């Protein structure tokens, strides 16, 4: 049970804006060791042409954004809950 706000950010399936250099995964590096109490909000970037898998970004209470390792059981559970809840 999380007490921080979460956001799902679906990206357009065909992003033909001429800025192909931006079509890449946001999370090139992830972390797995963060205490959930230090997180103020979560953002999910859905999979698409820019990246083959969804990405989970956490904003720490300090304002710093970090990417969470979606293979960790806790983060997998959070990601699944967010994706399932927002696709209705």
From Swiss-Prot:
Q: What is its main location?
A: secreted
What post-translational events are described? O-linked glycan consists of Gal-GalNAc disaccharide which is modified with sialic acid residues (microheterogeneity).
| Cystine residue pairs | 25-51, 27-67
| Keyword Glycoprotein tagged | yes
Q: Which residues form the signal peptide?
A: none
Q: Name one GO molecular function term.
A: heparin binding
Q: Name one GO cellular component term.
A: extracellular space
Which Pfam family is one of those matched by this entry?
IL8
Residues the record marks as carrying a glycan = 7
Matches recorded under InterPro entries: Chemokine_b/g/d, Chemokine_CXC, Chemokine_CXC_CS, Chemokine_IL8-like_dom, CXC_Chemokine_domain, Interleukin_8-like_sf
Question: Its Gene Ontology biological processes?
Answer: adenylate cyclase-activating G protein-coupled receptor signaling pathway; antimicrobial humoral immune response mediated by antimicrobial peptide; cellular response to lipopolysaccharide; cytokine-mediated signaling pathway; inflammatory response; leukocyte chemotaxis; negative regulation of angiogenesis; negative regulation of megakaryocyte differentiation
Please provide the record's keywords in A-Z order: Chemotaxis, Cytokine, Disulfide bond, Glycoprotein, Heparin-binding, Phosphoprotein, Proteoglycan, Secreted
Alphabetical list of SUPFAM superfamilies matching this protein? Interleukin 8-like chemokines
The residues that hold heparin are: 76-82
Q: What is stated as this protein's family in its record?
A: Belongs to the intercrine alpha (chemokine CxC) family.
Q: What does this protein do?
A: Chemokine released during platelet aggregation that plays a role in different biological processes including hematopoiesis, cell proliferation, differentiation, and activation. Acts via different functional receptors including CCR1, CXCR3A or CXCR3B. Upon interaction with CXCR3A receptor, induces activated T-lymphocytes migration mediated via downstream Ras/extracellular signal-regulated kinase (ERK) signaling. Neutralizes the anticoagulant effect of heparin by binding more strongly to heparin than to the chondroitin-4-sulfate chains of the carrier molecule.
What name does the UniProt record give this protein? Platelet factor 4
Species per Swiss-Prot/TrEMBL record: Bos taurus (Bovine)
